[in-house]
From Swiss-Prot:
Pfam families: Enolase_C, Enolase_N. It comes from Chlorobium luteolum (strain DSM 273 / BCRC 81028 / 2530). GO terms for cellular component: cell surface; extracellular region; phosphopyruvate hydratase complex. The keyword Magnesium applies. Catalyzes the reversible conversion of 2-phosphoglycerate (2-PG) into phosphoenolpyruvate (PEP). It is essential for the degradation of carbohydrates via glycolysis. Pathway: Carbohydrate degradation; glycolysis; pyruvate from D-glyceraldehyde 3-phosphate: step 4/5. The active site is at 204 (proton donor), 349 (proton acceptor). Its cofactor is Mg(2+). This is Enolase. SUPFAM superfamilies: Enolase C-terminal domain-like (SSF51604), Enolase N-terminal domain-like (SSF54826). Belongs to the enolase family. The lineage of its organism: Bacteria, Pseudomonadati, Chlorobiota, Chlorobiia, Chlorobiales. It is found in: Cytoplasm; Secreted; Cell surface. InterPro entries: Enolase (IPR000941), Enolase-like_C_sf (IPR036849), Enolase-like_N (IPR029017), Enolase_C (IPR020810), Enolase_CS (IPR020809), Enolase_N (IPR020811). Its EC number is 4.2.1.11.
């Protein structure tokens, strides 16, 4: 029987040199290990990432309290449970914590245990994790959102918006789409170098040059697509996809530059302009009418529900509008958004909610209500590639896991190559079909 007989956590370092939690789960015949990511721009409604707060050790970012919670309370409570009973394990974790935001034991403690149990269960069952979670119908490789230009909280530059991404949609296989992304990444690097701009990279592996404006950033990406020999799509207002090979996705992370007192969006890093919610929605409408944009994540601030409604009414029929800080992988927040008719997609970050079961329920709720799901990394990552497995397990169709540099990002892309190889002829790359706009 695959009975849990030991759970052990340790403090390791993530891709930014900050502590995070890694968990090992042992049964008599299987083993699972998982490392927990962390974010730079975090939503106020996210589950609590428990940090030690001792400024003299890792600047207060240690996670030894969370580690201790795993090695004592959680280890004792879960010993003897069947590692294959994922829902029961996750329910027990939630019961042990007993708070709505995981603030007692820490979402970082709970998630590490939840994911490691799933991996141990998969090993016991003799299955890949994606097959163990998703069953026989798990066969869809995700279209990647590749973060090639960084700004906002992810980079020390003059760009307000956090991520400018490319999405290779006009391909029949994941491996061809990945090659396209890599070639555009290198074309962009050469383009920046030719203009005397920095090719240093941000937290997620994208370039972080100092540019004159936010518009210059997206125009550089469009130019790089062409330089690499690929065809960008038309603006959303002009038919959008057509024979496009590549489209652009944005994550402005608008909560980061929303002034809650002024109720204005303040472009703090560039021209200092201040926009109302209606003006911000119109700003994005203008961009959608000008550039080949297929997706905008967090185009409005996390609690600006009225602004989100305006944006959805303006461009929600032709642009994927992804809620990250808005929904925080939380089924209750997503249900509220569905009821209010805001957005049409949810970003899925496992550490925003804290357990695998809750993550899968959020994805299911989205699917049942016609919302797409984008499986996502965090800016503070590790070599753990679980999200690649989850993307295929759920047939989500889209993944957001950084640029074509930094091993913490490439580990996910490379894991998807292995999954594609394992699936063989069963592998599906959805391309344009990943979108419902």
């Amino acid at each position: 029987m695959p009975v849990i007989h030991k759970i052990h956590a340790r403090q390791i370092l993530d891709s930014r040199g900050n502590p995070t939690v890694e968990v090992d789960v042992y049964t008599e015949s299987s083993f699972g290990r998982a490392a927990v990511p962390s974010g730079a721009s975090t939503g106020v409604h996210e589950a609590v990432e428990l940090r030690d707060g001792d400024k003299g050790v890792y600047l207060g970012k240690g996670v030894l309290k969370a580690v201790e919670n795993v090695n004592t309370v959680i280890d004792e409570a879960l010993r003897g449970m069947l590692v294959t009973e994922q829902e029961e394990i996750d329910a027990r974790l939630l019961e042990l914590d007993g708070t709505p935001n995981k603030s007692k034991l820490g979402a970082n403690a709970l998630l590490g245990v939840s994911m490691a149990c799933a991996k141990a269960g998969a090993e016991y069952s003799g299955l890949s994790l994606f097959r163990y979670i998703g069953g026989t119908m798990a066969n869809t490789l995700p279209v990647p959102m590749m973060n090639v230009l960084n700004g906002g909280a992810h980079a020390d530059n003059t760009v307000d918006f956090q991520e400018f991404m490319i999405m290779p949609i006009g391909f029949s296989t994941y491996s061809d789409a990945l090659r396209c992304g890599a070639e555009i990444f290198h074309a962009l690097k050469a383009l920046l170098h030719s203009r005397g701009l920095s090719t240093a990279v941000g937290d997620e592996g994208g370039f972080a040059p100092n540019l004159r404006s936010n518009e210059e950033a997206i125009e550089l990406v469009v130019e790089a697509i062409g330089k690499a020999g690929y065809k960008a799509g038309s603006p959303a207002s002009k038919g959008g996809l057509g024979d496009a090979q590549v489209m652009i996705a944005l994550d402005p992370a608008s909560s980061e530059f929303y002034d809650t007192e002024k109720k204005k969006y303040v472009f703090k890093k560039s021209d200092k302009r201040e926009l109302s919610s209606e003006e911000m929605a119109s700003y994005w409408e203008g961009w959608a009418n000008t550039y080949p944009i297929i997706s905008i994540e967090d185009g409005m601030a996390e609690d600006d529900w009225a602004g989100w409604k305006l944006l959805t009414e303006k461009i929600g029929d032709r642009v994927q509008l992804v809620g990250d800080d808005l929904f925080v992988t939380n089924s209750l927040r997503l249900a509220e958004g569905i009821e209010k008719g805001v957005g049409n997609s949810i970003l899925i970050k496992v550490n925003q909610i804290g357990t695998l079961t809750e993550t899968l329920r959020a994805i299911d709720l989205a699917k049942r209500n016609g919302y797409t799901s984008v499986i996502s990394h965090r800016s503070g990552e590790t070599e753990d590639s679980t999200i690649a497995q989850i993307a295929v397990a759920t047939n989500a169709g889209q993944i957001k896991t950084g640029s074509m540099s930094r091993s913490d990002r490439m580990s996910k892309y490379n894991e998807l190559l292995r999954i594609e190889e394992e699936l063989g002829e069963q592998a599906i790359y959805p391309g344009k079909q990943a979108f419902r706009v």
